Amino acid sequence: MTHKLTPMMQQWHQCKEQAGDCLLLFRLGEFYEAFFDDALILAQNLDITLTQRQNVPMSGIPATCLDGYVDRLVSRGFKVAIAEQADNTEGSKGLVPRTINRLITPGALLSSSLLPEKANNYVLAINQVGSLYGLSCLDLSIGTFLVAEYDNTKDLIEAICRLAPTELLSHAKFYQKNEAVIKQLQQHLRITLSEYVSWAFEYQSATKKLYTCFQVSSLDGFGLQGLVPAINAAGALLSYIQDKLLLPISHLSIPKIYGQQKHLLIDKASQTNLELLSPIHGEHRKGSLLQVMERTSTPMGGRLLRNTLINPFYDLKEITLRQDSVEFFLQQADLRKILKRQLSCVRDLERLATKISTSLATPKDIGTLRDSLLSCTHIADNLQNCALPEFLENKFLIAPPLCSLIKTLSTELIQELPLKVSEGNIFANHYHPDLLRLRNIKENSKSWILEYQERIRNETGIKKLKVCYAQALGYYIEVASNLAPQLPKEFIRRQSRLHAERFTTQELQQFQDEVFSVEDKLQTLETKLFKELCFYIVEHRDLILKLSTAVADLDYVVSLAELAAEYDYRRPLVDHSDALSITKGMHPVALTLLDKGTFIPNDTVMHSAQTRMILLTGPNMAGKSTYIRQIALLVIMAQMGSFIPARSAHIGIVDKIFTRIGAGDNLSKGMSTFMVEMAETANILHNATDRSLVILDEIGRGTSTYDGLAIAQAVVEFLLFTDGKKAKTLFATHYKELTELEMHCQHVENFHAMVKENSGQPIFMYEIVKGHSKKSFGIHVAKLAGFPLSVVSRAQQILHQFEGPDLRPEPEKAQQLVMF
């Protein structure tokens, strides 16, 4: 027998159907309740009590704590729908109407504590038409709108990994057809999958949505002609944001084609291996190149640094412009110090502009914008008389309309602004003629109350009589219970307390009506003025965003100059040659982790006409991996326009960096350690060019010695002799046989990590010198790792037998085993 649903639960089911796969928070009075499976999820993830009523599981959170709890849910990858109840101001009986007015997902955040300050927060839509893939992504918090198109899944996955969205959107058929793509993305990214109706991804629906959003009749002006899959993804994404999530899209910038400007390409594996954004072991930045380079003072500058780190420049002009600016500020220590202080006062102009454009801004946000814009004018004043490098020329010439806005915000607003419009006290008295008049009436009400209280005390003879105010009662007169009979008959009883009585009078009631009327008028006026001010600011949004870009650029180069000053970095010569020459180079991360002066610098000299490949041998723990990573990191920093930790450097522009470092099973894809190694190496062989930099560490370890050696040598020969694939390569290996290639190929040079011996014990020098290593010292490393001494001793015996005339050691007699 099924229970008949109550009207309220019928209402909940209707909302739940609309919410789809979102967790539904259903407003009931002063709480948001969850039912059935949602209640269980809520209780488990928020550590709140799970109860039940009539066998229906339920849990709830106070309405006053909603935002904090929602942030916790979204941070764990949940999508949340909020069903609000309509105002019941008229006190009508019956069921209060409830509708979903908000859906919150990880990728579609306009304003939230979850938004990373110095990184983008993208929601990305993906679509397939034939063999072509189109993608579109949005950062709603700043209005960035990107589209792209790819003809293979490899480039598609690499692009998505670089963008690192927190939410992926497509339709059911795409997810079913591209399970392998989704699995690869989930392996690299922490991403929430969202599904949307397939018709939104059709060309007619998508173009209609784009036309409506940008008020155009053609997309050719955006450069999107012919990009059908990308257009389909873009239109569907707009529909999802506006029609499904009920969020505004009017603030979005016009769609730009992602990847049009050529960059130094660093695939996801290399980003991970080189620890650009985070160390391999741990999700936080500590120990990453980003953590070392992060000296920015603004959110915009921080986002620019992060994006440039994984997308360094390929255009020599872009690199040189930034190098010139870094050099300028490196020589201007006093100016740099002043600018750092002023930049630290500039808040997130992009996200503030978005909040104002989408009617989410509070008065305090307007105050933050005002203070940030004022700081920008101070920055402009300090740069005014400087002979700025070309990169910054004219960027801080603040347009007259923006100057007028800044003046308005500076002179017409009260200094300390409230969090809510309803609190009032936003505008200066002179901003509107009615403001001062209404405020005077409100202010005079306080003195009227005091005068009225004193008058009726004298009239009644009750000296302890008080005139008070309470939210529920309004203004009232309070006297002790035993004195209440002394009051005149015109005093009207309002409330009885334990030891007091509360009254009102016709005069007090009339005063209250007038005061409340004034407060209502004042709140209505300030609300109207606040909306008008926001519209005025929105009219200047493009100018604010242009200034925001200038601030980001300035912050970027000033922070790099600060970094160079702190660690005595030098300017590398970057050009179109094929040189890779570094004198006294150092690993930028290791340099910060060691005591000053203890890191051993090393030289590197490579040139396509001479040394194209370095074969690096030496024992583990001697610094081989640090050295080869170091070269890649210095190239990346140089092509960011940064100075680098080296005495000098000459770097010909690199188009791609590939790394094959370390080993690890990929269980989710059913791939062994060796298979992962081979797949990543295959990617390098297919995609490297003559201008690429390839870092290979221990290729061929996961199979038999001869198999591994054969593969390693074949890879070396391919990169040495195949036209179009002659990349500069640093190859760290334990295969001594490979070092013989130096005798047969002029483009190969042997280097090794130097080790000295003292009484048979190795001393690692961490110097990279010419020639190949004679010993690997693996047993010594095993001893340092804590091997039992008996195992270490036996390994030494076996090693001596290997090195002797009999190359096959006999098992110890006491330990001999019958082998099959």
Curated annotation (Swiss-Prot):
Q: List residues binding ATP.
A: 618-625
PROSITE patterns linked? DNA_MISMATCH_REPAIR_2 (PS00486)
**Which SUPFAM superfamilies does the entry link to?**
DNA repair protein MutS, domain I, DNA repair protein MutS, domain II, DNA repair protein MutS, domain III, P-loop containing nucleoside triphosphate hydrolases
GO CC annotations on file: cytosol
Q: Name one GO molecular function term.
A: ATP binding
GO BP terms: namely:
mismatch repair
List UniProt keywords, sorted A-Z.
Answer: ATP-binding, DNA damage, DNA repair, DNA-binding, Nucleotide-binding
Q: Which InterPro entries match?
A: DNA_mismatch_repair_MutS, DNA_mismatch_repair_MutS-lik_N, DNA_mismatch_repair_MutS/MSH, DNA_mismatch_repair_MutS_C, DNA_mismatch_repair_MutS_clamp, DNA_mismatch_repair_MutS_core, DNA_mismatch_repair_MutS_N, DNA_mismatch_repair_MutS_sf
- According to the UniProt entry, the coiled-coil residues are none
> What's the family?
Belongs to the DNA mismatch repair MutS family.
The record describes the protein's role as:
This protein is involved in the repair of mismatches in DNA. It is possible that it carries out the mismatch recognition step. This protein has a weak ATPase activity.
Q: In its UniProt entry, what is this protein called?
A: DNA mismatch repair protein MutS
Q: Which organism is it from?
A: Chlamydia trachomatis serovar A (strain ATCC VR-571B / DSM 19440 / HAR-13)
Q: Which gene encodes it?
A: mutS
